[in-house]
């Protein structure tokens, strides 16, 4: 029986796969756009941005893993028609995301210089990285929340919302960063504010 072709299941799988693929493509295109803007700021800023991206990746990974757990929990309980568990799981997931966002803010803000020194030794590069981390760490609670929300919507099968919100997020990052850097002459400090605009836009979307 496991070889029986299920047309409706195939359509659903393709729809989910397409939405997920487009979401990932959108994120990567946004990162390319931001990197292109960073490259106009000089070698030191580009080096600092490379280092802080690694720190960001470490910071975001637990947030994403909590969101993946929320996705699995939502999907299982939606299938079981346990809306009460879905509500409780969603609430607990957001609480965990928020607590983690606060903790990682403290770590990255207080130890910004030490974290940068793990990757680079040049004082100018470290200075740029510390500036970035002091600003972005304050905002870490926002991606924690947006990751939790995306985990929820993926779990209930509404991937269009996650696709649209990711498109808004990455689009606003580039649209805000470009004039701040290329027109107003801001440095690496412009990037956290462009990310802030993206995360707020993501929540609104």
Model-derived features: positions:
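Small-residue-rich hydrophobic transmembrane alpha-helices
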Residues: 48-112, 143-157, 161-165
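Hydrophobic faces of transmembrane alpha-helices in multi-pass small-molecule transporters and flippases
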Residues: 2-33, 37, 58-62, 66, ...
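Membrane-helix interface segments
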Residues: 44-45, 159-160, 187-188
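Alpha-helical transmembrane segments of multipass membrane proteins
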Residues: 23, 27, 31, 60, ...
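Short runs within selected transmembrane alpha-helices of multi-pass transporters and secretion channels
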Residues: 67, 136-155, 161-173, 190-205
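Short alpha-helical transmembrane segments in multi-pass integral membrane proteins
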Residues: 1-17, 74-139, 181-205
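Transmembrane alpha-helix boundary and packing residues in multipass membrane permease domains
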Residues: 20, 24, 32, 36, ...
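Helix-terminus/linker motif at the lipid-water interface of multi-pass membrane proteins
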Residues: 25-54, 58, 76-77, 114-123, ...
């Amino acid at each position: 029986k496991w070889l029986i072709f299920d047309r409706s299941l195939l359509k659903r799988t393709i729809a989910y796969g397409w939405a997920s693929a487009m979401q990932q493509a959108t994120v990567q295109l946004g990162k390319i756009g931001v990197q292109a803007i960073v490259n106009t700021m000089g070698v030191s800023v580009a080096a600092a941005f490379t280092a802080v991206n690694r720190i960001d990746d470490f910071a975001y990974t637990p947030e994403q893993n909590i969101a993946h757990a929320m996705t699995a929990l939502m999907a299982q309980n939606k299938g079981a028609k346990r809306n009460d568990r879905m509500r409780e799981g969603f609430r607990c997931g957001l609480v965990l995301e928020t607590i983690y966002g606060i903790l990682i803010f403290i770590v990255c803000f207080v130890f910004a210089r030490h974290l940068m020194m793990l990757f680079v030794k040049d004082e100018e590069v470290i200075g740029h990285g510390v500036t970035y981390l002091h600003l972005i760490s304050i905002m870490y609670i926002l991606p924690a929340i947006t990751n939790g929300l995306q985990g929820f919507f993926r779990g209930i099968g509404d991937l269009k919302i996650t696709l649209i919100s990711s498109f808004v997020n990455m689009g606003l990052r580039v649209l805000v960063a470009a004039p701040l850097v290329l027109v107003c002459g801001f440095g690496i400090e412009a990037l956290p504010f462009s990310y802030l605009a993206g995360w707020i836009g993501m929540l609104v979307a």
